[in-house]
UniProtKB/Swiss-Prot annotation:
The lineage of its organism: Bacteria, Pseudomonadati, Pseudomonadota, Gammaproteobacteria, Pseudomonadales. It comes from Pseudomonas fluorescens (strain SBW25). InterPro entries: Ribosomal_Su5_D2-typ_SF, UDP-acyl_GlcNac_deAcase, UDP-acyl_GlcNac_deAcase_C, UDP-acyl_N-AcGlcN_deAcase_N. This is UDP-3-O-acyl-N-acetylglucosamine deacetylase. It comes from the Bacteria. GO terms for molecular function: metal ion binding; UDP-3-O-acyl-N-acetylglucosamine deacetylase activity.
Length: 303
């Protein structure tokens, strides 16, 4: 049986919020079967919990924000991408502020944290959402689509009219039955244009942003001294973002996601449309792991 997974141990980290620039304390904790991923604003009295579900998404302007009443948690997508990539079904994410720390702008540090905590299998079957037919949403020339696929695959295309992008691959397709999320996707960093960052800072956004936690591009090229981690790091980061956004379904996917110039808003619209169309998907479990179209690494021991 493919079993649900949680963390073996509690683990903590500190970072800054990308938009607030505030110091944030992050604690990842194990959670019981069928809890899902739940964000906890531990700085509030009483504490407020926000389950990582598509219906709890509020703002999607610069990142994916979860809301519960007037309480919010910003920038959840990179951590959720790491949870999805490592097959974590159940965990509590405690925060001391309203934003998940940006770390280095990728999912890599979160992967390291989760692997350091160790993974523990639980005595219940892991639930997958299997896509049964195509579902699409569009906004102008932007598009996001689910199609049936025996496995989990994410295809993405970006289209930036800028010298840095024109010279590089702007499309990628990753089939996770043959490609490692940890090696090939998790280290791709978020990116931004210097002109946009200056504008955002004037409006009290991206206050924590720097070349330490993003790829910064100006008219001449990439400002980061170390350059890119992958030749196609820009589009790989969009894939990383999409994986995090898709995990707001609450379960791992069996199917393919295709994005063309899609972002957090369109990704969330697609999830909501899928959830509404109950004939387009089904929940499945696997008593025999060898029959599953998706396999996960064996739980790693805590480091």
């Amino acid at each position: 049986m493919i079993k649900q997974r949680t963390l073996k141990n509690i683990i903590r980290a500190t970072g800054v919020g990308l938009h607030s620039g505030e110091k944030v304390y992050l604690t990842l904790k194990p959670a019981p079967v069928d809890t899902g991923i739940v964000f906890v604003r531990a700085d509030l009295d009483p504490v407020v919990q926000i389950p990582a579900r598509a219906e709890n998404v509020g703002e999607t302007t610069m990142s994916t924000t979860l809301v519960n009443g007037d309480v919010k948690v910003d920038t959840v997508e990179h951590l959720l991408s790491a949870m999805a990539g490592l097959g974590i079904d159940n965990a509590y994410v405690e925060l001391s502020a309203s934003e998940v720390p940006i770390m280095d702008g990728s999912a890599g540090p979160f992967v390291f944290l989760i692997q350091s905590a160790g993974l523990e299998e639980q005595d219940a079957a892991k639930k997958f959402i299997r896509i049964l037919r195509e579902v699409t949403v569009e906004d102008g020339d932007k598009r996001a689509t689910f199609v049936p696929f025996e496995g989990f695959k994410v295809s993405f295309e970006i289209d930036f009219d800028h010298p840095v992008f024109r010279d590089r691959t702007q499309s990628a397709s990753v089939d996770f039955s043959s490609t490692s999320f940890v090696k090939e996707v998790s280290r791709a960093r978020t990116f931004g244009f210097m002109s946009d960052i200056e504008y955002l800072r004037k409006h009290n956004l991206a206050l924590g942003g720097s070349v330490e936690n993003a790829i910064v591009v100006d008219a001449d090229g990439v400002l980061n001294e170390d350059g890119l981690r992958y030749e196609d790091e820009f589009v790989k980061h969009k894939i990383l973002d999409a994986i995090g956004d898709l995990y707001l379904l609450g379960n791992s996917l069996i199917g393919e996601f295709k994005g063309f110039k899609s972002g957090h808003a369109l990704n969330n619209q697609l999830l909501r449309k899928l959830i509404e169309q109950t004939d387009a998907w089904e929940v499945v479990t696997f008593e025999d792991a060898s029959t599953a179209p998706i396999s996960y690494m064996r739980p790693v021991a805590a480091v």
